[in-house]
Amino acid sequence: MNNIIISVDGPAGSGKERIAKYIAKNYFLYHLDSGILYRRLASKILKNKIDYKNKILLKKFIKSIDYISPRAHKLLRKEEIGNKTSKISAIPFVRQFINFQQKIIVKNMLKSYRGCVIDGRDIGSKVFKEAKIKLFIEVKPKIRAKRRHKQLIERGEKSIYSRILKEINLRDNSDINRKESPLVIPDGAIYIHNSDSFRSTINQIKKALKTI
């Protein structure tokens, strides 16, 4: 089966990227992390000192960009870029631009791969409604916060669990209530519970993808 599109949606910190990478590697698909596109755009905005609150200036700047690279880079994970990303991702014309970029990337990659797996927050509900298989990742906020806290501590970075939990709840509220492409469960989506071990998650994924 070729030209397979699989969407992986879920809230911040739910493990979408890890799950999408696993699917891409084990089912020979191209993986597109939509979050990287937003982070790359945020990085460009910071580098060019564009005031994102000035919508006219921001729209003009975005129109000057032909292509956003989907390649990941550790510098894109900087907190400054993450904060800017969360702000610009709520702007309707920014989301429309990134959605268009995703369409271009997937169209090109389907020429070389048997399919694509894309992770984000509105992939199955908005960007790729035609996805053959739609997954929605579920993890309780407290578990997501604990995982993030542990991750930061292991990196040698300072971390306060209560602060992380608060940020996750705020991000969830923002994603669910934004006007443009809110976080919703796509029609026909298969729930993947990622609160336990990753082995348990893998078993659910294998069951969901048995038709491909």
Regions found by a protein language model. Name each.
Residues 6-8:
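Hydrophobic anchor at the beta1->P-loop junction of P-loop NTPases
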Residues 11-14:
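ATP-binding Walker
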Residues 17:
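Walker A/P-loop
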Residues 24-33:
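Post-Walker A helix-loop "phosphate-sensing" segment adjacent to the P-loop in P-loop NTPases
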Residues 37-114, 122-125, 142-146, 154, ...:
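ATP-dependent small-molecule kinase phosphotransfer cores
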Residues 133, 183-200:
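Phosphate-binding beta-loop-alpha motif at adenosine-nucleotide cofactor sites
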